[in-house]
Amino acid sequence: MALPRPSEAVPQDKVCYPPESSPQNLAAYYTPFPSYGHYRNSLATVEEDFQPFRQLEAAASAAPAMPPFPFRMAPPLLSPGLGLQREPLYDLPWYSKLPPWYPIPHVPREVPPFLSSSHEYAGASSEDLGHQIIGGDNESGPCCGPDTLIPPPPADASLLPEGLRTSQLLPCSPSKQSEDGPKPSNQEGKSPARFQFTEEDLHFVLYGVTPSLEHPASLHHAISGLLVPPDSSGSDSLPQTLDKDSLQLPEGLCLMQTVFGEVPHFGVFCSSFIAKGVRFGPFQGKVVNASEVKTYGDNSVMWEIFEDGHLSHFIDGKGGTGNWMSYVNCARFPKEQNLVAVQCQGHIFYESCKEIHQNQELLVWYGDCYEKFLDIPVSLQVTEPGKQPSGPSEESAEGYRCERCGKVFTYKYYRDKHLKYTPCVDKGDRKFPCSLCKRSFEKRDRLRIHILHVHEKHRPHKCSTCGKCFSQSSSLNKHMRVHSGDRPYQCVYCTKRFTASSILRTHIRQHSGEKPFKCKYCGKSFASHAAHDSHVRRSHKEDDGCSCSICGKIFSDQETFYSHMKFHEDY
């Protein structure tokens, strides 16, 4: 097919621009590029056809220097790796007329006031914008051809807000920038053109939103705390247990140090846009059996794994056993949550429940469908007005009730312990009951150990310092902390430390005011079992009806009395 000469008019599709699609109402305004068949035909002509271009070059050289274009900013463009958001711009009639390689502008949900009120930006032509920002054959950089999209601005420290500029950034891959910083592309020593950007403009260029006091949700900051600036020594102040190689941070995520109160910790932040529905994982860590979990231990980075609706085991990401997912902090309330914990085939995954923008922290919590399944306390659930909160039916106004015997416990921990070691849950699997008390066991050897240690007072483990004996080696190890001074259990409310978790548990009740042990005679409550028993022995000795009619001994509780009576029955 013969190509027309440059002087001939080339038929093109007529483009109709609606009156509401003016540059003042759109964040990005471009006119379609003409067909490049003219330029291909011009290059095939003789030398005389270039005379008009040489005259134009001479006129441009004689003209005075053109000052920098007085625009404030250019609208950001989507990079090829990001998903396109459907905006009202794409519904315009002229959008379908654009060539397939045309760079698609990103239109924010609302146009900032500084764009709609700027006459310089509204009057700028598309060719000027393309020459100043997009490129072209000039000194500012290489030209971006039709088959390439404009890359997003680099996450350089000089472009970040002041709060994030002083933070400690751990990228997932080594930086490709030179240590000396960016160098001007002009080889003649001329400084490149500089533009004055306000903080409002900078947020719009980098994130596509404008921070304002009316919309605090659009601000990007460390939600779980304040960003910690690096120390004067220049070190990154990383803990000894943090192994950068084992973190395996995905592309687009980074690790920053934040502080909440006076306690510094780490958080995972987003360095590039993350769409809704992206899944990370699985969560890695040490497999811990349910019987090995300490009730008042550090279980902050531990997830429950369920099989057939029952708790199977835990995955503990504490220390160096976990990957980067163990540094994702929990959300304080549902509105700041952007990740949902999902269990799939015995593994825990984090899935984004909303769009996560650059420099936002990743915050995880359970999904709505997992609250009841994973036994989250009712106080953490959000109940809509007019609806009753969903909670465990076994919890009454008094506490947690045993369905077999009717006993009520103040805490679920004690009710579960009661169900574990009493015949109330005997479904045929506990075939070995103790003849001296009411406890029953699944295996014969467990019953033998129980009788040996509890009833016969067998204490084979002796302390070499004080001579005290214990039935189990673990009890001896806990006792040795008294002599060595080791106190590994610290109170979270004060600075006191203790040798055993049971002592810490009793101490914490002084701060919380909890008194789970209630006297059945007078109704007085106590924080520890020892204080309760001491009160019964001192105040209700005469009122206690649990007295042995054979030897005259008096017992404070019925279980001890029944165990004592077994000895008289056997003899």
Curated annotation (Swiss-Prot):
Broad class of enzyme this protein falls into: transferase
Primary site of residence: nucleus
Cellular component terms per the entry's GO annotation: intracellular membrane-bounded organelle; nucleoplasm; nucleus
Disulfide bonds: none
Alphabetically ordered keywords of this record: DNA-binding, Metal-binding, Methyltransferase, Nucleus, Phosphoprotein, Repeat, S-adenosyl-L-methionine, Transcription, Transcription regulation, Transferase, Zinc, Zinc-finger
SET domain residues: 251-367
E.C. code: 2.1.1.-
Protein's UniProt name: PR domain zinc finger protein 14
